[in-house]
Amino acid sequence: MDEKQRYDAGMQVRRAVLGDAHVDRCLEKLNDFNGEFQEMITRHACGD
């Protein structure tokens, strides 16, 4: 599984667990400080 596939799978799990509204709010608040962390959480905590 490549990084994009892992991210996509993680996003599906993240949305199923946390709900679309919460995930959408998090994505709207992405910035230089938290962007890489949010991506890492989505790929590794939810996608693996």
UniProtKB/Swiss-Prot annotation:
Q: Give the main EC class.
A: lyase
Q: In which pathway does it act?
A: Aromatic compound metabolism; beta-ketoadipate pathway; 5-oxo-4,5-dihydro-2-furylacetate from 3-carboxy-cis,cis-muconate: step 2/2
Q: What is its EC number?
A: 4.1.1.44
Q: Which UniProt keywords apply?
A: Aromatic hydrocarbons catabolism, Decarboxylase, Lyase
Q: Does the keyword Membrane apply?
A: no
Q: Which GO terms describe its molecular function?
A: 4-carboxymuconolactone decarboxylase activity
User: What does the entry give for GO biological process?
Assistant: catabolic process
InterPro entries for the chain? AhpD-like (IPR029032)
Task: Please list the reactions this protein catalyses.
Answer: (R)-2-(carboxymethyl)-5-oxo-2,5-dihydro-2-furoate + H(+) = (4,5-dihydro-5-oxofuran-2-yl)-acetate + CO2
**Entry keyword annotation includes Nucleotide-binding:** no
Which family does the entry's similarity section mention? Belongs to the carboxymuconolactone decarboxylase family.
Supply the name of the protein.
Answer: 4-carboxymuconolactone decarboxylase
Its lineage opens with: Bacteria, Pseudomonadati, Pseudomonadota, Gammaproteobacteria, Pseudomonadales
